[in-house]
């Protein structure tokens, strides 16, 4: 089986879409680092050994030429590893799980040019930078100490997980190189801006639990279907545009939107069907549900509840009345030009 054939059989164990949130959101997978927990300063050197490799290798497959076989899957989780230099010799690996160790350096992975799937969660990495890996589809670096998004340029990368790191700003994600990237997970970082996420192929973007105050730089994401902004500090709904024509699910729970008038800024999203605004000050207004439907007639669900036909009919009446009132307003009188003076 060639690497091209194997692309369809890679093992994406991360969800591409956000589940509905009836309760406080639970993290996908284990929390490798509890809130406030610090990493120990030093660990005893623990290199990856041949014995560990024998225990962790599985999935025997044909190599590229079809004449030989090699194990292509490796799992060496929770081994207190500080060094994976030995991986340089295992060039046929396609699936690698090195999570829950104490790794600070991923450079040996640069030799794994057949790699399709990588999970390096819960280590001590400060960067996700690696050489360009031509077949890598899924990469997860959750719960490390990563501070930037530089050096990620794998052309077939589809899903990138950087949840639970220390990233303040997104930089270096080049849309001309990341031509297949459709899902980016940046939940639980320290992001202060949404600038730098200029990835036109992006479909799912998770930015919950950051320090965002507004949405900016996402206006041209025409393929985006899911945008998750829960638990930030957003108080305005500016930054959305008609170009975001595929957006169906928008989660703004736990932000600071106080003015119901902000909802009007979402009416240019033609496919928006589900909006979550729980735990925002504006939800205390008695006309909250009605105002949302008046502004967004195609909305199907607000927070946990779907709209009933009676609510839709009432919103239609209000919308029609507002339209008629606007049509009856006198046009503002234009100032006369000097040469048009009546004197």
UniProtKB/Swiss-Prot annotation:
Domain LRRCT, first and last residues per copy: 280-318
Region (Interaction with RSPH9): 208-343
Signal peptide boundaries: none
Domain of life per record: Eukaryota
Pfam families with a match to the protein in the record: LRR_9
GO biological process: flagellated sperm motility; radial spoke assembly
Biased composition (Acidic residues): 1-30
Main location: other
InterPro entries with a match to the protein in the record: Leu-rich_rpt, LRR_dom_sf, SDS22/Internalin_LRR
Coiled coil spans: 307-329
Tissue specificity: Expressed in spermatozoa.
LRR repeats: 92-113, 114-134, 135-155, 156-177, 180-200, 201-222, 223-244, 246-267
GO CC terms: cytoplasm; cytoskeleton; cytosol; sperm flagellum
Region (Disordered): 1-47, 318-343
Skewed-composition ranges (Basic and acidic residues): 318-337
UniProt keyword terms in alphabetical order: Cell projection, Cilium, Coiled coil, Cytoplasm, Cytoskeleton, Disease variant, Flagellum, Leucine-rich repeat, Repeat
Subcellular localization: Cell projection, Cilium, Flagellum; Cytoplasm, Cytoskeleton, Flagellum axoneme; Cytoplasm
Subunit structure: Component of the axonemal radial spoke complex. Interacts with RSPH3. Interacts with RSPH9.
Function: Essential for sperm motility and male fertility. Plays an important role in the proper assembly of the third radial spoke (RS3) head and the bridge structure between RS2 and RS3 in the sperm flagella.
Illness: Spermatogenic failure 92: An autosomal recessive, male infertility disorder characterized by asthenozoospermia and defects of the radial spokes and doublet microtubules of sperm flagellum observed by ultrastructural analysis.
Protein name (record): Leucine-rich repeat-containing protein 23
């Amino acid at each position: 089986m060639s690497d091209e054939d194997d692309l369809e059989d890679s093992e994406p164990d991360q969800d591409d879409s956000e589940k509905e949130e009836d309760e406080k959101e639970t993290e996908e997978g284990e929390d490798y680092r509890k809130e406030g927990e610090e990493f120990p300063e030093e660990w005893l050197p623990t290199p990856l050994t041949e014995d560990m490799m024998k225990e962790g290798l599985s999935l025997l497959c044909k190599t590229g030429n079809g004449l030989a076989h090699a194990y292509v899957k490796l799992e060496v989780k929770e081994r207190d590893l500080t060094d994976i230099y030995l991986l340089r010799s295992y060039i046929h690996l396609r699936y690698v799980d090195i999570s829950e160790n104490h790794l600070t350096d991923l450079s040996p992975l640069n030799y794994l040019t057949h790699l399709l799937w990588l999970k390096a969660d819960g280590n001590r990495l400060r960067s996700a930078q690696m050489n360009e890996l031509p077949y890598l589809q899924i990469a997860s670096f959750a719960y490390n100490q990563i501070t930037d998004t530089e050096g990620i340029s794998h052309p077939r990368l589809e899903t990138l997980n950087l949840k639970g790191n220390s990233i303040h700003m997104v930089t270096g994600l080049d849309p001309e190189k990341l031509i297949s990237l459709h899902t980016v997970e940046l939940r639980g970082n320290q992001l202060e801006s949404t600038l730098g996420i200029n990835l036109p192929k992006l479909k799912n973007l998770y930015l919950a639990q950051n320090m965002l105050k507004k949405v900016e730089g996402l206006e041209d994401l025409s393929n985006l279907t899911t945008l998750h902004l829960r638990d930030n500090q957003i108080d305005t709904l500016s930054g959305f545009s008609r170009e975001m024509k595929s957006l169906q699910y928008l989660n703004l729970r736990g932000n600071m939107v106080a003015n119901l008038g902000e909802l009007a800024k979402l009416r240019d999203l033609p496919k928006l069907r589900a909006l979550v605004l729980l735990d925002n000050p504006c939800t205390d207004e008695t006309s909250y549900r009605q105002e949302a439907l008046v502004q967004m007639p195609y909305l199907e669900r607000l927070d946990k509840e779907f709209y009933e036909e009676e609510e839709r009919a009432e919103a239609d009446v209000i919308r029609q009345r507002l339209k008629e009132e606007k049509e009856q307003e006198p046009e503002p009188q234009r100032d006369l030009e000097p040469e048009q003076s009546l004197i």
